[in-house]
């Protein structure tokens, strides 16, 4: 892999996994306590390990993959909204982030992964996705974002800042939910 491809793949992974690693576990913990977060991560890890896209696990992995899509549906959209807030806070390109989000958020085969990828790509002015080789096989991915500039090492820093800030906002959101549930129940 060339340097720019490594950078692009890293940014793409951080952006996509903002939901899986942070916002969704926080969201499900807010609703069902720590067990909700643990159960979500368990389903997500099983999906990532034996998802139905390989012939070996087609029968076993289909259910966890679909369940992960369902469990991540609301958190992915919350993550995109929180990430857009963080884009503004970090003084990145919020206008482009919103435009790319509106245009590209449904481009991925997964109903959830392009939500945060599109915000991140727009905020950084880069393009994610495209055809790449993994393990010697061509994998076709939809193009997300506008190629306003080439990927640079600094983009990894900003993608991580978006992940961390979005996680912080998710924790604040969770505190509000848990407090509301405490007084309602």
Give residue ranges: language-model regions.
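Hydrophobic alpha-helical transmembrane segments
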Residues: 3-38, 43, 51-185
């Amino acid at each position: 892999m060339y340097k720019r491809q490594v950078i692009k793949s890293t940014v793409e992974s951080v952006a996509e996994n903002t939901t899986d690693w942070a916002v969704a576990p926080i969201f499900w913990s807010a609703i069902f306590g720590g067990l909700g977060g643990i159960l979500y991560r368990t389903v997500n890890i099983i999906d990532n390990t034996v998802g139905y896209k390989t012939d070996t696990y087609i029968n076993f992995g289909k259910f966890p993959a679909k369940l992960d899509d369902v469990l991540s549906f609301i958190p992915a959209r919350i993550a995109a909204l929180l990430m857009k807030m963080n884009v503004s806070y970090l003084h990145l390109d919020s206008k482009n982030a919103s435009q790319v989000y509106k245009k590209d958020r449904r481009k991925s085969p997964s109903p959830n992964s392009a939500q945060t990828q599109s915000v991140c790509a727009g905020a950084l002015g880069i393009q994610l996705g495209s055809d790449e080789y993994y393990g010697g096989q061509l994998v076709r991915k939809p193009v997300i974002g506008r190629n306003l500039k080439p990927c640079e090492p600094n983009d990894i820093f900003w993608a991580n800042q978006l992940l961390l800030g979005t996680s912080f906002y998710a924790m604040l959101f969770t505190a509000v939910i848990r407090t509301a549930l405490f007084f309602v129940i």
